[in-house]
């Protein structure tokens, strides 16, 4: 019959690395940190949503967060999303974009992010969003 195989299946080294990664995630409480910092970010982003009409939605779980950027008529604002993404990069904060119309800002920081880093991210994003009012 057909033999099933996997490149990494059963490799002692791969298994050892996987075990160590899981141990670090547990020992450093990275899941708890993702929830705590993620909740903080989502709360802060929802505050920004209340101040900027072009934020249509904030959604996510843990540290996987999306911010929908829209036009006044509710349609996808692809160009504005690209502008925000590039301005954040100019400020040395790497974020991405996604979605069928590429109008969702994607925030996926490392599991080790601290609250101080999240505060800086929100402050920088707020400044960039204020600048959008001049850009449009």
Q: Over which residues does each language-model region extend?
A:
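Conserved N-terminal phosphate-binding loop of PLP-dependent enzymes in the Aspartate aminotransferase
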Residues: 1-136
